[in-house]
Regions:
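Short acidic donor-binding/metal-coordinating loop in glycosyltransferase active sites
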Residues: 102
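Hydrophobic packing residues within well-ordered alpha-helices of enzyme cores
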Residues: 21, 62-66, 115, 175
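Short glycine-enriched, charge-decorated loop/helix-capping segments at active-site entrances
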Residues: 25-30
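Generic beta-sheet signal
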Residues: 8-10, 97-98, 127-129
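N-terminal nucleotide-binding beta1-loop-alpha1 segment
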Residues: 1-24
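Conserved core of the sugar-phosphate nucleotidyltransferase
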Residues: 105-188
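Short, Lys/Arg-enriched, disordered terminal segments
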Residues: 1-7, 94, 179-188
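Conserved N-terminal catalytic core of the sugar/cofactor nucleotidyltransferase
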Residues: 2-3, 36-99, 110
Length: 188
């Protein structure tokens, strides 16, 4: 059967405290005239019609942005990432779900798509995606976990980078530099 990624659900986690960045709504920071979250949603839209953002009531800009783009939003307590993740997955109640931070910038959509395709029909409950042996912050859930349940997981390594997590201002500045080099024709 030919692979189709249109049935995959993307869950974008946007309820963090933004401690290292100094801004709890870092996903709303501008990158190339669009927010980080807006860029991520624009990148994922060709891959799936099922994109949901999980956030908290403390993230008003994020909630309003999602409302303006008709992106379904799950409101969590924002106290514990694991609880927020579990609550969100249970609320969606559909697998497979690809979970990623709302502060992710996809740098190579074609390669990202091929990584997703390589996991098609995996029977492993969770697949954590690595880039050059470093966790990318992206995981595929093939099963909805029970509350507090620890699921078996597997790591899939991509030897080619396809995304960048924007965790600090330095990461944001590095991405802006990468994008300016790409625009100037110097990107390799």
């Amino acid at each position: 059967m030919e692979y189709s990624d249109s049935g995959i659900t993307f869950l974008l986690m946007a309820g963090g405290k933004g401690t290292r960045f100094g801004d709890q709504e870092k996903c709303m920071r501008d990158i190339d005239g669009n927010s980080i979250l807006g860029n991520l949603i624009d990148s994922l839209t060709p891959l799936s019609h099922f994109i949901t953002v999980s956030t908290t009531l403390k993230h008003g800009k994020t909630i309003e942005f999602c409302r303006s783009r008709n992106i379904p939003t799950i409101i969590t307590e924002g106290i514990d990432y694991t609880d927020d993740l579990w609550h969100s997955i249970v609320k969606i109640n559909k697998v497979p779900i690809i979970v990623m931070g709302s502060d992710t910038y996809i740098t190579d959509l074609g390669h990202f798509r091929s990584v997703i395709a390589s996991m098609n029909n995996s029977e492993i409950p969770i697949v954590d995606i690595l880039q050059n042996n470093i966790f990318s912050g992206i995981s595929l859930f093939n099963r909805i976990p029970g509350k507090g349940e620890i699921l078996e997981y597997h790591e899939l390594n991509s030897e080619k980078n396809f995304s960048l997590n924007i965790n600090t201002l330095e990461d944001l500045n590095r991405l802006k530099l990468i994008l300016s080099q790409k625009t100037a024709g110097h990107f390799q």
